[in-house]
């Protein structure tokens, strides 16, 4: 019989409902002395510039399905989470909401007053997301998104303009699964940014250059390649693919675009090293 040590026995599958209720209990009931994180978020919610037409944190939570109810523990009033969080998508939505509330609503100087609670919440969320291969990403305009980990995407995001970096990371957001229109817009952004360096890419990696721009120009990204009335652009093979097959090809284009950027980055790195070597010899 196999023996498992203490840390191996601690490993367990993520129960999204349990994790949600555990995090909510910290937010709703743990105090820094006088107030809870829930109190602080509710007090400052109207200052949040991204709140759209929501007037309170309670309204937002209930709209998203994360309801709470008041309970009595002896003479003490406490709050209990009553929302249903069974799926990974719902759990990710909850995590995005909480992280945006903590770091978007609570002023930085006030966050220090709730450091113990914030650290507890963030460590739980970070750990749970790690188990499902996701992480928290902050966009240039201050939004916090939960996206799937992609080493190539992260590497490219570090070397391109902030706006393009956000788009590259957002491509892996769970809400974009099945959203060809949004994926198409991101692919076009990637292609338009690569276009000025196309000739350079061709000398570095002709195969990637040829394949990437072939797909961009014939798979309904830059042009309408599904319109049979325009024979100059019509791609019958692509047009007849299923919706899912088209998305799979879009994902291939995305990965090819990342490889293009990484190929160019490697050339830049090699030039930098060569320049350093040359100066050293002199």
Give the positions of each predicted feature.
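Charged interaction/catalytic cores of defense and host-pathogen modules
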Residues: 1-123
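Short amphipathic alpha-helical segments and their helix-coil junctions
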Residues: 64-80, 162-179, 231-241
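Non-transmembrane, amphipathic alpha-helical segments
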Residues: 83, 113, 156, 175-178, ...
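Helix-loop junctions and short alpha-helical segments
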Residues: 86-167, 172
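Residue-level detector of well-ordered alpha-helical segments, enriched
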Residues: 86-94, 185-189, 212
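Generic structural signal for hydrophobic core residues of well-folded globular domains
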Residues: 98, 102, 190, 194-197, ...
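A mid-sequence, solvent-exposed acidic-amphipathic segment
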Residues: 165-194, 198-199
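Alpha-helical oligomerization segments
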Residues: 188, 199-282
